[in-house]
Amino acid sequence: MKIKSKWFVIFIAAVLIIGTAHYVFAAQNDGSQESAITLEEVVVTATKTPEKRKDIPNAVIIIDKKDIQASGAKSIGELLANETGIDWQTYGNYGGANQEIHIRGMRGNATQVLVNGVNVGSPSLGIADVGKISIDNIERIEIVKGSGSLLYGSGAMAGTVNIITKRPKRDKMDMKVGAGYGSQNTYRVAAENGMFVAGNFGYYLTAGRTETDGFRDNSYLRQNDASLKLVLDKKDIIDISLYGDYINRKYGMPGVKPPSGTRDYYIGGEKFYNSEAAALLDHSGDKDGHVVLEVKGKPVKWFGYDLKGHYTNMENHNYERYAYNGSGYENWVTNQVLGTDGHVDIYPFEGAKLLLGGEYKNFDWKNEGFDLDTTGKQTVKTTNEAQIFTKSAFTEAEYRPSQYLKALAGFRHENNSAFGSQNLPLFGLVINPFETTALKINHGKHFLAPTPNDLYWPAGPYTRGNADLKPEIGWHTDVTLEQSLLNDKLFMTISYFHWNVDDKIQWEPDSQGVFTPINLASYKADGLEVGTRIGPFYDLTLALSYTYTDAEEENREYTRQDYGWPPFIPPDFQYSMVKRRASYTPDNQFKGDLTYKSNFGLTVTATARYVGDRVVYRTETTTYPDTKTVTYTLNSYWTADLKVQQRLYKHWILSLSGINLFDKEYDTHLTTFTDQTTWKTSPAMYPGAGRSVFASVAYEF
């Protein structure tokens, strides 16, 4: 790929420039330890144990509570969008739209999202919807880029996002109540309280309610969420925490925006679509709950432990009607996960650490569905159930022979009841030529297991699962340089990455014309990430991030799709395999934040984001059954956001935020729409949300 020569040379040049900067600014650092604050930040997710940022071989992003407050973001997706290597993707930004985090050009199922170290992604989809996680409950987010399969198994191919929730503080009571209202009849009320109530025992409780009508017809959201964390903290000897959360939400599924001029369409007095939404009757709902019990400690200098037990219950309801005759489908998909994992970390001598761990998960999957007749009544019922379990053992060894060098190596063996086993090695190296410089190199194998939907989807006339799927496998390599200068008032990071995936799982028509998942081909990418944070100077802080991704996919290009008339006339599908630019992956992304923070409680943050163009491929009929592949382009776009926050009398917080201030129009995904009055099928988009404003007031005790 073209980036391998051109951009790797640019990366090396940037490394030399940043390295030289150490000497230029060394005198201003005065050798002070304060200059290494950023690289001294502690990260848990990268190695499952607390490590300083300068000691881990991965590129990381760390976002704390102050960053969240200053951002004005109302969701995790808004918060992380366009950070280095991060692409936030939705189907239109409406109330209940699925929100995925894509890292370094990989799909959403290649990012493992954790809450307190436990995967919260949907097992049946293999993707985590971060829109279901309340931002009020977050203390800190750690994003570790690069292969995470060594420690976290399937799905951690591009990276891991670990969301750490709030916990009580000693000698301090936390209490906050707030309410806000904004565009599209959106409101949010929330409350939280935490403290130690008896010696070493404490709690932290959050609860909230969100409603919005959305920016299009049938894009509403109604959501209730709550969480509770109980802790028994005896410091290093033992720390026991019991965490639980629950979310109950209902939301509309508006589909694409039909072409201009589309008229209202009715069947039997029910309106099925209009010019704003292709689906006015479709809706979904989620009832998700998680419970995590964690026991950890480091009773002696040379030994630590961390044990978890967890249970997840996720129920998703979908109701869908078809505009061509009014029939439809309604189903409930239930995922239950019971698991345990743990590790011990041993420090045999100075500079050395050995981590030994294991994990077990049991997945129960159930899909209960009903066909709907033309009036929307339930008719034929189908029920499918499956069980999958995984068990694994992993080890990781680290050694730092001097302050200038650290090496890491690890290995994981995982057994999956559906497809067998995988062996996953990882190697890392950290070079610290100076106290405020870290050169990081890591190379690891990753994999993605097929989901229960892929394996066991009910067999029907148009779709069915494939129990013979293999996992996706590949390797991820990255080289990162991090440099802190001017007493941490200047922080720079630059990363070069390369990854590849074989046996990509994709749904395609089989020899009988039935769509089924297959291990199709491969895809890969090279890229460059650059980020800097400057300040505060004169109460101003500037943060910039840029990501270049050159991603390539191998896929089918069909020249003929003849569904025949089985069993009399067999189907005939003809295609060739081609390599092309990866779909829905922008080459260029940029984010700039400028924050002003006064000494009288005022904080103002202006954010600009740029997303480059994205390509989409569709198979279209020329003269049946002949077809061709048509390439569509979703245009690049800029958005601008502004957040103003004023703290009054120490306890009151007034906030006003504006998203997409200039009301920029842009599209997020593409599919087709068929007008039932003309039978014309044309491309149609999922539009992004326009300008919105949200004002809130909160009181902190």
Regions inferred by a protein language model and the residue ranges of each:
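Extracytoplasmic beta-strand/coil segments of soluble accessory domains associated
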Residues: G77, A81-V118, E139
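Short acidic/polar hinge/loop motifs at secondary-structure boundaries
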Residues: V118-K145, I163-I164
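Outer-membrane beta-barrel signature, preferentially recognizing the C-terminal barrel domain
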Residues: Y265-K298, A386-I388, N432, T436-A438, ...
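Surface-exposed extracellular loop regions of Gram-negative outer-membrane beta-barrel proteins
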Residues: V256-D264, S417-N423, I431, E435-D478, ...
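Gram-negative outer-membrane beta-barrel transporters
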Residues: R400-K406, F497-N500, N519-E620, A698-E700
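Transmembrane beta-barrel wall of Gram-negative outer-membrane proteins
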Residues: Y181-E211, R216-P254, L281-G304, P348, ...
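Face-selective signature of the C-terminal outer-membrane beta-barrel domain
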Residues: D233-I247, S284-S421, N432-F434, L490-Y496, ...
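Conserved C-terminal beta-signal and adjacent last beta-strands/turns
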Residues: F8-I12, A21, V231-D233, K298, ...
